[in-house]
């Protein structure tokens, strides 16, 4: 089993992508977890297969799980339209680039935990092309990291003291000192 994540930003507000992926063999414990997720639907967190179109499932079989509780139809349409297509294309890009061996496409499965900013529902000027491209790149990057075991434990240990979480840096910049 392999695990990876990526953060890709750089577009308009609300278009950043932060997928987390788990990749494993479909005929083992991972496959059991994959099937259980499909069968265990929860309101607001529907799990769906990543598809290229209404009846063209991507390979390796990829299950999308939303990190955000889905509450409205517009958000659902963006998640199950633009982002679903982007994830499917990111998976195929990973096969094309050799991160996932083509001859393993029927044996492996991918679970993608998807972050889609809820603000997209209210963006009247949402650029679906930018949103698509960012989620596609983020999916490919997360899969690449997973399949290449990145970052390595050696790199993490070497850089541990110089890595500062973005959220922490942002909070520190706005912190008021109290004595």
Question: PLM features: residue spans?
Answer:
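A short, hydrophobic C-terminal helix/tail in secreted or cell-surface proteins
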Residues: 173-179
């Amino acid at each position: 089993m392999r695990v990876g994540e990526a953060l890709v930003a750089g577009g308009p507000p609300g278009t950043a992508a932060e997928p987390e992926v788990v990749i494993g063999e479909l005929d083992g414990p991972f496959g059991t977890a994959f099937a259980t997720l499909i069968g265990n639907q929860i309101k607001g967190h529907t799990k769906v297969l990543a598809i290229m179109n209404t009846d063209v499932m991507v390979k390796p079989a990829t299950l999308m799980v939303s990190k955000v509780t889905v509450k409205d139809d517009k958000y659902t349409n963006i998640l199950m339209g633009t982002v679903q297509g982007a994830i499917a294309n990111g998976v195929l890009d990973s096969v094309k680039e050799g991160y996932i061996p083509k001859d393993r496409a029927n044996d492996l499965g991918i679970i993608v935990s998807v972050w889609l900013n809820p603000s997209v529902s209210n963006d009247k000027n949402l650029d679906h092309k930018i949103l698509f491209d960012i989620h596609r790149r983020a999916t490919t990057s997360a899969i690449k990291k997973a399949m290449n075991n990145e970052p390595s434990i050696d790199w993490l240990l070497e850089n541990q003291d110089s890595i500062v979480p973005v959220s922490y840096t942002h909070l520190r910049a706005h912190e008021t000192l109290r004595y």
